[in-house]
A protein has these predicted regions:
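A short, proline-enriched helix->beta-strand linker immediately N-terminal to the Walker B motif
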Residues: 85-89
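C-terminal portion of ABC ATPase nucleotide-binding domains
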Residues: 45, 53-58, 103, 118-124, ...
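Conserved catalytic motifs of ABC-family nucleotide-binding domains
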Residues: 16-35, 70, 137
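ABC ATPase nucleotide-binding domain helical subdomain, centered on the C-loop/LSGGQ "ABC signature"
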Residues: 7, 25-65, 109-117, 124, ...
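Catalytic Walker B motif of ABC-type/P-loop ATPase nucleotide-binding domains
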Residues: 91-94
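ABC nucleotide-binding domain signature
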Residues: 4, 10-15, 128
Length: 181
C-alpha cells in the first residue's frame, strides 16, 4: 500500500487544525474529489449543516484565513466534517469537540453512533477519540486512561469507574460529584 493510499484511509480532526481562505465547501473537500452530496452529509453528521444553511451563500460562504469569521465551535464542526467527508476507515478526533457546547457534542456523538450502527459490516469506520470530557467517550467500546504519557487504565466506562481511581475522579468532577451513568 502506498503512503498516499494509507493516508486516504484516515480522517483526522484536531482541536486547532487549519481552515484556509476559500469557501466552506472547499474547506471540507480539502482538495479531494468529493461530491457535494457527500459534503452535505458529512456536515450534517458534524452538526455543521444547520449553521452553514443559515448563511446567505451557504456552502459557498467565503472563509477568512484560519476561519476567523467563525466561532470556535463552528470551526471545529467544519474540521470534523472535513475528516468525515472522505468516508475514512479510521477517524481520529483529537480533542476536536472541545469548543462545542454539550448539546452539540451530544448530537455529534449520536450521529456518529447512528452512522456506525448503519454500517455494521466491513465498511464501518473505527473511531479514535482523544478527549478530556468523559461524556464524549463514555459510550466507547474501549477507553484508555493516560497519565503523564502512560496508560493507567483500560476498559469500558463502567469498568473504569470500578477499577481506575483517576478516571472515577475525573468523571465525578465533571458531573458535580456524581458518577456518570
Amino acid at each position: 500500500m502506498s503512503p498516499a493510499e494509507l493516508r486516504s484511509r484516515f480522517g483526522i480532526a484536531m482541536q486547532n487544525d487549519f481552515l484556509y481562505a476559500g469557501t466552506i465547501e472547499d474547506n471540507i473537500r480539502f482538495g479531494r474529489d468529493i461530491p457535494h452530496e457527500q459534503i452535505v452529509h458529512a456536515a450534517a453528521m458534524a452538526q455543521a449543516h444547520g449553521f452553514i444553511s443559515a448563511l446567505d451563500d451557504g456552502y459557498d460562504h467565503k472563509l477568512t484565513v484560519k476561519g476567523t469569521n467563525l466561532s470556535g465551535g463552528q470551526k471545529q464542526r467544519l474540521l470534523i466534517a472535513r475528516a468525515l467527508a472522505g468516508n475514512p476507515d479510521i477517524l481520529v478526533l483529537d480533542d476536536a469537540s472541545s469548543a462545542l457546547d454539550y448539546k452539540t457534542d451530544a448530537a455529534l456523538r449520536k450521529a456518529l453512533r447512528e452512522e456506525a450502527e448503519a454500517q455494521k459490516d466491513a465498511t464501518a469506520t473505527t473511531t479514535v477519540i482523544v478527549a478530556q470530557r468523559v461524556s464524549s467517550i463514555k459510550h466507547a467500546d474501549l477507553i484508555l486512561v493516560m497519565d503523564q504519557g502512560a496508560v493507567i487504565g483500560c476498559g469500558t466506562h463502567d469498568e473504569l469507574n470500578e477499577t481506575c481511581s483517576v478516571y472515577r475522579e475525573i468523571a465525578e468532577s465533571q458531573m458535580g460529584g456524581a458518577i456518570l451513568e
